């Protein structure tokens, strides 16, 4: 399996619109530098087994932070961040 984690951490980039999208999807009001720090920490703290490449995107699922990141595998550009649905345990 390829080492997506180190490549993404070294080359991650952002578009101007993605900051607003992340704040909206995660229901936060973070500044650009806070978002970049949060994304870096999520990627760094996620086990490589939770990196899944499907088509042109890499999905990074961090259950501890309850977040899934979507990153373009060709450009290493973050596309979005989504909250995971919490399942009710019986």
Feature-to-residue mapping (PLM):
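Ribonuclease/tRNase effector modules and their secretory precursors
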Residues: 1-90
């Amino acid at each position: 399996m390829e080492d997506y984690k180190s490549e993404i951490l070294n080359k991650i980039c952002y578009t101007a619109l993605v900051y607003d999208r992340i704040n909206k999807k995660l229901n936060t009001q973070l500044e650009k530098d806070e978002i970049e720090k949060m994304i870096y920490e999520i990627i760094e703290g996620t086990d490589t087994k939770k990196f899944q490449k499907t088509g042109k995107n890499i999905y990074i699922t961090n259950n501890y932070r309850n977040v899934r990141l979507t990153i373009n595998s060709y450009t290493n550009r973050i596309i979005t961040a989504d909250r995971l649905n919490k399942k009710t345990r019986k």
